[in-house]
Amino acid sequence: SDVYKRQFLRRAKTNILTDIPLDEVRDAFATTFRASGMSITDAQLSTAANVTAGYPYMIQLVGYHIWDAADMRDSDTIIDADVTAGIEEARIDLDNAVCIPELQGLSKNDREYLEAMAASDGPSPTVNVAQRMGKTPNYAATYRKRLLDAFVIRETERGEVDFAVPFLREYLRRNQ
């Protein structure tokens, strides 16, 4: 099944890409755009960098789509509308390539657990997740374990979990 394929791929030997500091993302965007003759403001660079949260795949998507938006206008000057459109397209691509496949094959209760986690802005105490679900901590622990085993969430400290998949919290909030 698709769940087992995703689990196999996650367990395969991989190179772990950590989040990139936002100042480095901003500098990389500036260097890339400007070295290619594109004009982009410091404010636009900051907006583009901040929205990526340093996630490597999102960096790639945002940069590509901002560039593409300006290119579609046949312009070498990035305007705010290019940044906005680029960010929107990057989110759509990330949702389709990462978030939607991640949720496929999960049970209704697995998803309910994730939606309860998404109510927090950061790591969620497991007791709060259970309360949001309207379930006992022991009941919710079954789904916590399944999601941990599937690498969808991670334990940040004892009794606390967070999303292991970047931007999944935001996707769930937009699509509840």
Q: What function would you assign to each model-found segment?
A:
Residues 133-150:
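Short amphipathic alpha-helical interaction segments
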Residues 17-44:
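Conserved small helical "lid"/interfacial subdomain of P-loop NTPases
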Residues 42, 54, 60-137:
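Winged-helix-like regulatory helical subdomains adjacent to P-loop NTPase cores
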Residues 167-176:
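Short, amphipathic alpha-helical interaction segments positioned at domain boundaries
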Residues 2-4:
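Short, small-residue-biased leader/transition segments that mark boundaries at the very start
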Residues 8-13:
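Short glycine-/polar-rich loops that comprise or flank the Walker A/P-loop
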Residues 159-166:
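Minor-groove-contacting beta-hairpin "wing" of winged helix-turn-helix DNA-binding domains
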Residues 148-158:
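A short, conserved structural fragment
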